[in-house]
């Protein structure tokens, strides 16, 4: 019977949960916004991990995103050390933070669909009367 999850996926899921707590509790930089970890992709040899984040709030502009990525990049070594203490893994991957724009794109597409449906209804109501 084949495994449903590979080892790298299990480690990535655990890292996602641990990092969410560690970033919230351990990173004391006041410039850091509300960061949400959307995914963690771990390489097969467990040497690198891409950590995908989103930044919530009204300051969802490119400068704020860049600043948050820089702060997390500077704290990557510290976070890796904390992960080493909390996870039962021999080697902890190097952390590389990337912005995940899929949430924003999904919201924009949903808004476009809702607007198109509303315009459709308006046209149907106008043609019936």
Curated annotation (Swiss-Prot):
One of its GO terms (molecular function) is ribosomal small subunit binding. It is found in: Cytoplasm. Keywords: Cytoplasm, Ribosome biogenesis. GO terms for cellular component: cytosol. InterPro entries: KH_dom-like_a/b, RbfA, RbfA_dom_sf, Ribosome-bd_factorA_CS. It comes from the Bacteria. One of its GO terms (biological process) is maturation of SSU-rRNA. Pfam families: RBFA (PF02033). Signal peptide: none annotated. One of several proteins that assist in the late maturation steps of the functional core of the 30S ribosomal subunit. Associates with free 30S ribosomal subunits (but not with 30S subunits that are part of 70S ribosomes or polysomes). Required for efficient processing of 16S rRNA. May interact with the 5'-terminal helix region of 16S rRNA. Monomer. Binds 30S ribosomal subunits, but not 50S ribosomal subunits or 70S ribosomes. Belongs to the RbfA family. HAMAP family: RbfA (MF_00003). This is Ribosome-binding factor A.
